[in-house]
């Protein structure tokens, strides 16, 4: 049995996807479309367009960088590193762009467990740029991977001090969770709950925090308030709460509601598949996964394909 909470942290680091300008309109058609696809999560299309831009010599540094980000998002970490290296070798790599590339390359190095290389990039960033919440988090995550717990803690504290948001607290918690150090991350969740909700999005975030803390009663209360405020994402989270409580019927109802309301119902189909797996209805799970795959972006696709493997393992039907 796999840990559903850990599956929610496939993407641990949130980094800027800022775009730089230049060149004439005709030359940048593929580049601009690639940037749009990258922002929208259409990573395979973005990769193809960036590769076309590279072959045409359009914005080489930015195009190599974009292709690297697409490869990173698609889970091709070694190839991502190669693209980032190529980007850094280009002429006229501005300071802001270099910071962006080094940050992404450090993430890729973490993914392939080349912690020394990741640390070297973090040190370069610290020496040449003003530290911000993202860089503190990245440095903390690298230190944690290298079992430098005190250094990790110090950097995470700096990250949260710079950006005391629900998302940052959840991100730090996720880093600890992925290292089986959940208790160390829980204090950030507790800190995030010290404020009050101002809108439906806040209620959704608070519900997510309570869910990670296994406080299902408060999670349910917050998420219902978010749903009353027309927050669609809260439907998926409430479905997960019901699943963990063993209430498959209500979980399915939430996931079905999400499928009917969301622009992209992939998360809802994935949730329905999880319910079917729990119920032992593997054929229905495969049907839901297939429906989800038809509408999924790259990140949802990873989860759907993972669950498809789980179903086939349970069916013993390879």
Residue ranges and their predicted role:
Residues 66, 73, 97-104, 138, ...:
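Canonical tetratricopeptide repeat
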Residues 28-29, 61-62, 96-100, 134, ...:
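Start-of-helix register in tetratricopeptide repeats
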Residues 35, 69, 107, 141, ...:
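Residue-level recognition of tetratricopeptide repeat
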Residues 58, 92, 96, 129-130, ...:
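Short coil turns that delineate tetratricopeptide repeat
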Residues 39-40, 73, 111, 145-146, ...:
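Register position in tetratricopeptide repeats
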